[in-house]
Amino acid sequence: MLCQTYPETYAEQFAEKTHRLEQLLGDLPNFDAFASEPEHYRARAEFRVWHEGDQTDYIMFDQQSKEKVAIHHCPMALESIATLMPKLMAHIVQTPVLRQKLFQVDFLATLSGEMLVTLIYRKSLQTKTETGVENDVAWVDAANALRCELPITHIIGRARKQKICLDKDYVIEKLQVDHQTFIYQQIENSFTQPNAEMAQNMLHWARKVAAKANPDQQNDLIELYCGNGHFSIALSDQFHRVLATEISKTSVASAQFNIEANKVDNVTVVKMAAEEISAALQGETFFRLKDIDLSAYAFNTIFVDPPRSGLDDLTRQMVTEFDYIIYISCNPETLAHDLEAIRQTHEVLETALFDQFPYTHHIESGVFLKRKPK
C-alpha cells in the first residue's frame, strides 16, 4: 500500500474480512465488527527520502515492481501528519543541514494532538571528543527552529548508532473509552497501536467481556505480552489485581510510566517471557518473582495478545488452566490453530473483528472463551 485509500469500496473490503474470519474460525457467536475510518486513521507513518538534484521527496517502494514512488500526500495518515508532511519537506529543502544525507522521516502522532518527528541520516550527527560526545550544533539549531515554526512537539535526529533527542523521545496519547480517559506513553521506535481510534474500540470490547468474566471484581487477571500496559491499565478496574508480563525492557519501563500516569495501584508488571510465567505458575522459582507471591492471587481470567506466530505449545496449554480467556489476535490463521486446542476445554462466548489496517489483508480479532462445565 502506497498511502492510497479507497473510501468508496471500504464497506465491501470490510465485509470480505468478516467473511474470511468466519471461514477461518467457524461460527462467530455474539460477533462485534468494528470498522475503521476509511481515511486518516494511521497514527504512525514512515517514509524513505529520495534526493534528485534540487528535488527531495518522500518515497515508498511498490511491493510488486519494487520501483520507488514519490508520496506527495498520504490520506491514510492522521490529518495532523498529512497536513504536516508537505510543510516539513518544504522547510527541509530550504535548510541544507537538515536536508543533506537525510534518508528517512518517521511520524508518530496522537489523537490528543502531540507530534513526534524522527529525521534519520546517513551522516554523523555527533562527534567524539576528549570530554565525551558533542552534538552537531548547526543541526540542533536548525531542528529547534523547525520545531518552533511547525506543529511538532518533539524532534529526534538519528544516524548509525547515534541519537539526538531535543527533549523527549515519546508522545502522550489519551484514549477515551467508556467515559474514561486512559493515558499512554508511546515511545519512538517501539511498538504502539497504529490505529488509535481502533485501539479505543479494542479497549472497549476487552472491558466489556472482562466485566462478564469477573462481574464482582473479586478475582484477578494475568496478562501475557502486555507491552506498555495498554490493556492491563484499561482492565485494572475490572479485576481485584492484575499481574502482567512482558519481555521487552523498554516496554516494561513504559508500562510502569503508564501505571503511574493513570494512578493505578493494582497492576504489577514483571519482565518475564510467557513460558517463564507458565513455569512459575507450576511451582518453578524465579528471582524476578521474589517479591511476588503467586499463591496469593486468585486468577480466574487470562489475557493474551501474542505475536503473529500465536501461542507456543506451553502457553497454549497454560491458558486452558483458567476459567476465562480473552485472546486478542493479529493473525487469524494462528488464532484458528490455537482455538483447535483451546476449544477442547473452553467454549467461545464472544468474538470481534477490529479493522486496524484497512485496505490490507491483515485482520485483528478478539475471542472471549469460558471453561466448559465438567
From Swiss-Prot:
S-S bridge residues: none
Keyword Kinase: no
Enzyme class label: transferase
Gene Ontology CC: one annotated term: cytosol
One Pfam family in the UniProt entry: tRNA_U5-meth_tr
InterPro entries in alphabetical order: MeTrfase_TrmA_AS, MeTrfase_TrmA_CS, SAM-dependent_MTases_sf, TrmA_MeTrfase, U5_MeTrfase_fam
Entry EC number(s): 2.1.1.-, 2.1.1.35
Entry's Gene Ontology BP terms: tRNA methylation
Residue positions of the active site: C330, E364
Role description: Dual-specificity methyltransferase that catalyzes the formation of 5-methyluridine at position 54 (m5U54) in all tRNAs, and that of position 341 (m5U341) in tmRNA (transfer-mRNA).
Family, similarity comment: Belongs to the class I-like SAM-binding methyltransferase superfamily. RNA M5U methyltransferase family. TrmA subfamily.
Protein known as: tRNA/tmRNA (uracil-C(5))-methyltransferase
Naturally occurring in which organism (per UniProt): Hydrogenovibrio crunogenus (strain DSM 25203 / XCL-2)
Gene: trmA
